[in-house]
């Protein structure tokens, strides 16, 4: 891929994004060596990508199971539109929920949570059921955990 006029991203930007997704702690100098750019040129590209909202954050990837949150679930909730705002506020403060998606289909929201055990899950469901019917799926295993995005090669 050379230059994508829709996104304004060129091949070097994609390579930079690829490297940062693999290790966001790499120094400008290390990135520059891999990209054959000077550290200031790397910094300029990163700043431009940040300003355009392409790079939103630099984060650590936490193993929730190592923190005692080994039960991972998806919760689907049917919420009446008049209650969306209250529901969203409740979700923001509910322990264990780390994703909330407003979706199409029979459900209104799909949540992803990590809790300690079945008792913790039951308490969470009891809080959510006040907003409407819930359906829960326990994640038994994960076949694909892709957090690394790359462009389709032409």
Regions found by a protein language model. Give the residues of each.
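A compositional/biophysical signature of low hydrophobicity enriched in polar/charged and small residues
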Residues: 1-154
